[in-house]
Amino acid sequence: MSYQGKKNIPKITSERLLIKGGRIVNDDQSFYADIYMEDGVIKQIGDNLIVPGGVKTIEANGKMVIPGGIDIHTHLQMPFRGTTTADDFTQGTKAALAGGTTMIVDHVIPEPGCSLLEAFDRWSKWADEKACCDYSLHVDITHWNDSVKQEVETLIKEKGVNSFQVYMAFKDLYQMSNTELYEVFTFLGEHGGIAQVHAENGEIIAEEQARMLEMGITGPEGHVLSRPEELEAEAVFRAVTIASQTNCPLYVTRVMSKSAADIISQARKKGNVVFGEPITASLGTDGTHYWSKNWAKAASFVTSPPLSPDPTTPDYLNTLLASGDLSVVGSAHCTFSVAQKAIGKDDFTQIPEGVNGAEERMSIIWDKAVVTGKMDENMFVAVTSTNAAKILNLYPRKGRIAVGSDSDLVIWDTDAVRTITAKTHHSAAEYNVFEGMELRGAPMLVVCQGKIVLEDGNLHATSGTGRFIPCSPFPDFAYKRVKARKQLAILKAVPRGMYDGPVSEFSPMSRGGTPSASTRTSPTKVPVRNLHQSGFTLSGPEEAPIRPAGRRIVVPPGGRSNITSLS
């Protein structure tokens, strides 16, 4: 891989650290052991370790020691209509570190028609200058042609990108047709990429938005009313279908509704290689706030797909996350100031979309899923760190506490209780969608690149110390099954003799129409009735057939069939 690292950027001076008496928790096991770190790498794990002098010793006192969190979905320093999101790479990564996350994966969003490579270089420069923790990049495909195809191949082979997002919404801007989705998924499947999808039916959303505005609904409630969860579920089903046909691993971002989550759950049970990503907000809050009398508060919840107005949705999504039907949690952290949100004060379609969640992500999951008994500590590590590392092909460098892994880890205090408020959070946004929530579980100490960056509530993060972590193609976590299926799915024609029977004559099919049959009729023998010819007539109703008296029509055993069933 030819990616060249940044130059003249501050480096974290790694410490020699020894964590003693901790309970190491990985996604597959928990055990008590000491950890010795040097040069940003875990060097030893065990009891009675022999370590050099000058080591800083940290007493974990039996507390959990977990891999640093990986936030697989952020939008930091994102340009939007001449402005940028409230949190740049410095502010956003500080918020992440404060919550126990030691690596983020940001989305590069090229303007339609612009070069993907140029956008990637621009985002890389911003992150190199400001990120306080390690980072990787997804690249969003906002248009599709031969030139873009070549750039995607370059990004995979030379730039360390293995995941690309496409959009099924945002009509006339980013939205792709089914044909384009098929072509993108096919190409990514051949080159070892992960197809990410923003799943909503953009065509119907556009119609519903216009209808809401015509009715005089201009506030944030119009956002959720114009985007019912069925439109998310339909798009997810369509994306799963196309990905299955192209044998490409699919990653559904922002799973916000029960219906969409159910589609993913059913697909996984059928063997589809699909990963679902609920976000911090969909696990921790709901869409009832869109009807708040406070416009600024209501607008702070505007994101797409919208948060579900069904208040039981977060608990439902946490249950599917705990069971493994949903795979990984991102924050989709994308914050705007009140003034920026007010761009859409008279038209909800103009409200900049995005919510906070990078800092709160791990505590929300612990409080809503682990404390409630839905999820154990090992699954907590899987959905906050390990699964993301595996999907991005970074495991076991990231997402695991093991000898040779990066020394990114967290001492997690299961007894800590904190109240979320915008007054003390590390984001620059004035609102926090989790305002007032009392959450159990928080980081007590955070080590990033072998250096303590959070201790006793004090953050010691340095702008520009984050490193770009390249992601290689064909991650086993997704592609082992795909490769096996490709070997079994070779299509072959059926050997048969030449057909030498009669052939009907038809006029050439016109585009957009149906073929016109010639005057020749299909061969029949008199007096046998031609069963291909309809006996239906518009001349009047036929007499109903006579039934013997007393005979009842009953529903067949098992009930009437339902051709709309997803099963």
From Swiss-Prot:
The keyword Cytoplasm applies. It holds the Pfam family Amidohydro_1. Keywords: Cell projection, Cytoplasm. It is found in: Cytoplasm; Cell projection, Growth cone. Residues 513-524 have a biased composition (Polar residues). At 16 hours post-fertilization, expressed in the presumptive nucleus of the medial longitudinal fascicle, the presumptive trigeminal ganglion and the spinal cord. Expression in the spinal cord is strongest towards the rostral, more mature, spinal cord, and weaker towards the caudal spinal cord. At 24 hours post-fertilization, expressed in the olfactory placode, in the telencephalon and diencephalon but not in the proliferating ventricular zone. Expressed in the epiphysis, the nucleus of the medial longitudinal fascicle and in the area close to the nucleus of the posterior commissure. This is Dihydropyrimidinase-related protein 3. It comes from Danio rerio (Zebrafish). The gene is dpysl3.
